[in-house]
């Protein structure tokens, strides 16, 4: 009976450990974070800060935006940090409301890049403009084109409108949706390509100086594009994960982000409750 009882207690203890990452013999805890790019200094600095708190961060890199949420839902990672609220809202629409934001990282205005022209005003009849093909960034790029007076969108465009919602296109611009990671690679083949800042940096572009057009970071309409740490809903109050969110706000991390992105991304501190409120609002609009 004693052996049976000990076995049950041991099994229960293992379940507790599994529920909040994995722990090592020295008492430190390993947390796997899914990312779509780990270049630069911000992650090594965050890992060092976390190590001082007894947390080992293991980065798991993905090459496709569709994979980190799947991996999180499947329990292959503990957190992810690659998406903004609007992207997460679209995921929730298609896969269920099981992943939630627990902290903010950065906001990064999307930019229009070109090897052929120096202003969106120089677009010619029938020119091609590449945009990311995921619904949230696709809509974001189209709004930027409207703000630059290239196109006009329907009044019911909403948060996830697509090219079918273009109601005026005086220059008959051809919109070419491509996988986000491919947006820098198609630059030789199009007049303009809208590229997320993280991907632009990985491609050797300067997200602050190289765009011929940059989204207005002070516009309230881009609040849904605050990037976040996300976890499975059952883990939203996990103290270890919350500690990582807190550590991201460290001044050393902020300086690294500024350096890594050439000033193209800004670390922001938005409360979990505010992030989840925005997520809920976006889901209700769909």
Each language-model region and where it sits:
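C-terminal motif of bacterial Sec signal peptides marking the signal peptidase cleavage site
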Residues: 15-19
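Bacterial signal peptide processing site
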Residues: 21-23
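Short, well-ordered beta-strand elements
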Residues: 26-38, 55-61, 127-129
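An extracytoplasmic/periplasmic, membrane-proximal ligand-sensing/linker region
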Residues: 29-31, 38-42, 52, 186-190, ...
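Short helix-initiation/N-cap motifs at beta->coil->alpha
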Residues: 60-70, 157-185
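Ligand-binding "clamshell"
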Residues: 90-102, 117, 189, 194, ...
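A conserved helix-loop-strand patch within extracytoplasmic ligand-binding domains
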Residues: 102-152
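A bilobed periplasmic-binding-protein/Venus flytrap-type ligand-binding module shared by bacterial periplasmic
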Residues: 109-120, 224-238, 243
């Amino acid at each position: 009976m004693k052996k049976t009882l000990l076995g049950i207690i041991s099994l229960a203890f293992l379940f507790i450990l599994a529920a909040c990452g994995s722990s090592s013999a020295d008492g430190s805890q390993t947390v796997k974070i899914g990312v779509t790019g780990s270049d630069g200094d911000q992650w090594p600095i965050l890992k060092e800060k976390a190590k001082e708190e007894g947390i080992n961060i293991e980065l798991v890199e993905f090459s496709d935006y569709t994979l980190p949420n799947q991996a999180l839902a499947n329990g292959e990672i503990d957190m992810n940090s690659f998406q903004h609220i609007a992207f997460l809202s679209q995921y929730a629409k298609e896969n269920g409301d099981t992943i939630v934001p627990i902290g903010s990282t950065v906001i990064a205005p999307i930019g229009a890049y070109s090897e052929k022209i120096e202003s969106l005003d120089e677009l010619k009849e029938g020119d091609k403009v590449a945009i990311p093909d995921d619904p949230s960034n696709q809509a974001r790029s189209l709004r930027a084109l409207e703000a630059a007076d290239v196109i006009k969108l329907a009044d019911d465009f909403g948060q996830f409108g697509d090219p079918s919602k273009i109601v005026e296109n005086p220059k008959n611009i051809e919109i070419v949706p491509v996988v986000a990671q491919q947006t820098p690679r198609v630059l030789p083949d199009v007049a303009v390509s809208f590229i997320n800042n993280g991907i632009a940096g990985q491609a050797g572009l300067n997200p602050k100086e190289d765009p011929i057009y940059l989204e207005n970071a002070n516009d309230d309409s881009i609040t849904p594009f605050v990037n976040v740490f996300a976890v499975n809903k059952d883990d939203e109050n996990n103290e270890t994960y919350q500690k990582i969110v807190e550590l991201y706000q460290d001044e050393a991390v902020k300086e690294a982000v500024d350096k890594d992105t050439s000033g193209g991304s800004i670390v922001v501190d938005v409360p979990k409750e505010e992030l989840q409120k925005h997520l809920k609002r976006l889901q209700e609009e769909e």
